Amino acid sequence: MDLADLVKDVKRELSFSELKGKRVSIDGYNALYQFLAAIRQPDGTPLMDSQGRVTSHLSGLFYRTINILEEGVIPIYVFDGKPPEQKSEELERRRKAKEEAERKLERAKSEGKIEELRKYSQAILRLSNIMVEESKKLLRAMGIPIVQAPSEGEAEAAYLNKLGLSWAAASQDYDAILFGAKRLVRNLTITGKRKLPNKDVYVEIKPELIETEILLKKLGITREQLIDIGILIGTDYNPDGIRGIGPERALKIIKKYGKIEKAMEYGEISKKDINFNIDEIRGLFLNPQVVKPEEALDLNEPNGEDIINILVYEHNFSEERVKNGIERLTKAIKEAKGASRQTGLDRWF
């Protein structure tokens, strides 16, 4: 769901110094897809090992997580569980979009169109269960806390934030705000220079912060009303939304009538355009399936041997680079723990 037009006046650039010593609950699937999209060879294909297995996600997870830790940020990776049944239409839409992109990719290959090769190679990204499990395995070896969500990862990341177990949720999507996150950090795992699609132009990507309380105050609405706006625009549970209604119009409607049903009562929205259960979708955001972690979400000492086994022996990473990464990781975890303790002490003074 795209709330970009509504958050543009309240989002702000976030420096890593502001994040130092703080825990951030990261939408793991979202981060892995970002790594798959960003870490590519010149022809647009992902990094692979000698057996042809994709390794872009592991490369991004290892090195980017180290970078984040070196800034004093403590990452908690949250992974999706079983998606709600209401998401099936959106998942089917994504599957068909990938099939169409695969056809266009083959055409681009036969015609030698390099830019289209890159474009459609990214569009066919798939994150398999094996890739997810090996990502978790790597994170455990690195000493990074992970949380397995019962359902939506973003909902769980937001829940950890609500519980005070993280300072913010991190994702490129805005759904975490609807799920109740107090703060949303974007661009945490993709900071750096990125090429604009279909242009030979690079832009600097920096972390952004959106604070829910400030957003709601600026818009003059409640979280429940923001959820209604999301439903009108279209969410993962009703991807088409209401035809002809974008973010600005949705905001005007909800501010005028308070909720979707009232707008329907006054004829602002036609009942025939509602082919989904409004209360059901609201419930998915207001009362999502989440779980309170039983284990402490602390950083642990990295297991260098396990990291080398996963990256070097299983996936042909450079042993020298990985060993250098382990040294950086060990030092960064030690310093991040110190920064976290200092942040805790600062609250008392």
Curated annotation (Swiss-Prot):
Interaction with PCNA as annotated region, ranges: 341-349
Cofactor note: Binds 2 magnesium ions per subunit. They probably participate in the reaction catalyzed by the enzyme. May bind an additional third magnesium ion after substrate binding.
Keywords of the record: DNA damage, DNA repair, DNA replication, Endonuclease, Exonuclease, Hydrolase, Magnesium, Metal-binding, Nuclease
Domain of life: Archaea
Cofactor dependence: Mg(2+)
Annotated EC: 3.1.-.-
Residues reported to bind Mg(2+) 1: 27, 80, 152, 154
Annotated spans, N-domain: 1-98
Residue numbers binding Mg(2+) 2: 173, 175, 236
Record's keyword annotation contains Acyltransferase: no
Molecular-function GO terms, alphabetical: 5'-3' exonuclease activity; 5'-flap endonuclease activity; DNA binding; magnesium ion binding
Region of interest (I-domain), ranges: 116-258
Function according to Swiss-Prot or TrEMBL: Structure-specific nuclease with 5'-flap endonuclease and 5'-3' exonuclease activities involved in DNA replication and repair. During DNA replication, cleaves the 5'-overhanging flap structure that is generated by displacement synthesis when DNA polymerase encounters the 5'-end of a downstream Okazaki fragment. Binds the unpaired 3'-DNA end and kinks the DNA to facilitate 5' cleavage specificity. Cleaves one nucleotide into the double-stranded DNA from the junction in flap DNA, leaving a nick for ligation. Also involved in the base excision repair (BER) pathway.
Family according to the record: Belongs to the XPG/RAD2 endonuclease family. FEN1 subfamily.
HAMAP family, alphabetized: Fen (MF_00614)
Descriptive protein name: Flap endonuclease 1
Native source organism of the sequence: Saccharolobus solfataricus (strain ATCC 35092 / DSM 1617 / JCM 11322 / P2) (Sulfolobus solfataricus)
